[in-house]
Amino acid sequence: MSKAQKRKRLNKYDGESKTPANKSTVDGGNPYPTLLRPTAEECRDVRDALLSLHGFPPEFANYRRQRLRSFSAVDDHDTQCNLKSETLNETEEESVLDGLVKILLSQNTTESNSQRAFASLKATFPKWDDVLNAESKSIENAIRCGGLAPKKAVCIKNILNRLQNERGRLCLEYLRGLSVEEVKTELSHFKGVGPKTVSCVLMFNLQHNDFPVDTHVFEIAKALGWVPKTADRNKTYVHLNRKIPDELKFDLNCLLYTHGKICSNCKKNVAKPKAKVASPDDCPLVGFYDLIV
């Protein structure tokens, strides 16, 4: 990218406000109130560039269809509870409890291993009641292929025990009727369920416009200059959720995650921000990285 092109694109996105931060300019707790990036236009450009390269990731296509359906129909929450708390059937629309457990099993492991762990859990314990009544060691054995089996088994068991004791049934469908903040409060009561897990449940299973920050999203956001290099994940989550338009959050998040997993150019840029990488033909984010090199 030429210097003139860099200047033109940088001006287009207007990276930082010239107004010094003070109490009146802090955007409701935004940790970086003077950082204007990412702009809505930049988010759209990055989304479109990654969509052209990858297409929409097929592993997230079903969640995308559920989002589209949810915006055009109102669910009967009680009916869903009666149906979805009984079995772990992959052919049905994923329940909130299924989704939460899947996300927990995906922590600190590969996607294929977490999928194998959930499939093994389903095969061993067809109903959530079976999991609740099982010995922790049996749950560990069922999910061992996903890694951290003792820790994850305890977490799953704690969730089920709390649901049974406090609500009388193993179901999280009631979360569909709550606001984002109410969902965060409810899920934070479960030991082992952290902010990223909650955000993933909000986006994938509850169809809220939330933007989870996993390792791939976090590192690319820093490399793009969307947050400072010194940012942590919590501040990145707050900033990106305030700056990225709601209508772009789901697609952009899925695409950044997918791209971060497979793009060697982005891995170089994350490791060494000033490293020379290939052309935009190989990675469409190269031109965006050029803005901050």
From Swiss-Prot:
Its EC number is 3.2.2.-. CDD domains: ENDO3c. Residues 1-10 have a biased composition (Basic residues). Gene3D superfamilies: Helix-hairpin-Helix base-excision DNA repair enzymes (C-terminal), Hypothetical protein, domain 2. GO terms for molecular function: catalytic activity, acting on DNA; hydrolase activity, acting on glycosyl bonds. The keyword Hydrolase applies. DNA binds at N108, K151, H216, D232. The active site is at K196. GO terms for biological process: base-excision repair. It is an enzyme of class 3 (hydrolase). Residues 1-34 are annotated as: Disordered. Keywords: Glycosidase, Hydrolase. InterPro entries: DNA_glycosylase, HhH-GPD_domain, HhH_base_excis_C. Belongs to the DNA glycosylase family. This is Putative DNA glycosylase At3g47830.
